[in-house]
Every structure is written in structure tokens, then in C-alpha cells.
Amino acid sequence: RAGGKWGEYPAVYPHPIDQNILPHIDSFLETGYTKEEMKMVNETHKIFADDSIGVSPTTVRVPVQGGHSESINLEFEKEFTLEDVREMMKNTPGVTLQDDPANCVYPMPLYAWGKNDVFVGRFRKDPSVKSGLNFWCVADNLRKGAATNAVQIAEKLIEKGFLPKE
């Protein structure tokens, strides 16, 4: 049955989806990645016209009404401050900043559903690389396409000098 209960396996999923998270979307390839994960890699390269961009996704099926959520890790060419990133995002059309984790304010798909904006938050420096940024992003994927979102973010990053113009 749709949604499934413990021990009941809907034909759509290999395991129960109710009260569960499945760490794959689509079929697995010989590389260990799924078709959906490779689609993310290929779309990123196509959108930015740059096959050298490193992308290492893991797609996860989460039983929510709608929307896509992403944990994003970026490495910039130059140093940045979290305040600069927050200010840039706050002033980017189509982006809503929700970044006050101490008060449990961060993007969630439940509140993005039916809205056109992309919601971003949980900004923090990535300690594993020199100029790295980690953040959380959610959007209603029926309202905001991945390509539109990526282009808008890239344009703002180029404008602020975090990415090269070429």
C-alpha cells in the first residue's frame, strides 16, 4: 500500500518508505552512484559549461509531500566571510535567507512547498578545505527548476567575485 507499514513493501520502493529514508534514487550503476546522482553531476557540468567542476552527490528519498533539499559544499577561489555570504543571499532575488540555527530557524521542505523562492541557511565554514562553505537549501521543485536556481546562484557568485567570469 502507498506509504507502506513495517513489513509491507510497496512495489515502487525496495523497502518501506513510511518512517524511513532510502539512500538512493533510481538504479545503481557500476560506479556505485545512481542514475539520479550522475544526472546531478552532468546537469551541473552542462549548466556551468565546465566539466572540471567537482560534484559528488548522494541522493536520498525522504517521505515528504514535496520539494528538494540539498546539503551543499562549495570551495571558492578566494577567502570569504559568512556575513558576506549571508548578505549576498539576503539580497538575491528568488532566495530567502533562513539562517538562525540557535533559534531553530533554517530551511525545511514543509515550509517551502508551494512557494517560488529557494530557501537557504545553516551557513558555516568547511574546515576540510581552505575556502569552503557548507549550507542547506530547500525548494519546491515544481516551482523552482534546478537549472534556474543554479544559474541565479552562479550569477551572484560571479558578480561578487567568488567564481571566475570565464
Map each language-model feature to its residues.
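Active-site-lining helix/loop region of Rossmann-like oxidoreductase modules
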Residues: R1-M88
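C-terminal active-site/capping subdomain that shapes the small-molecule cofactor and substrate pocket
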Residues: I53-E166
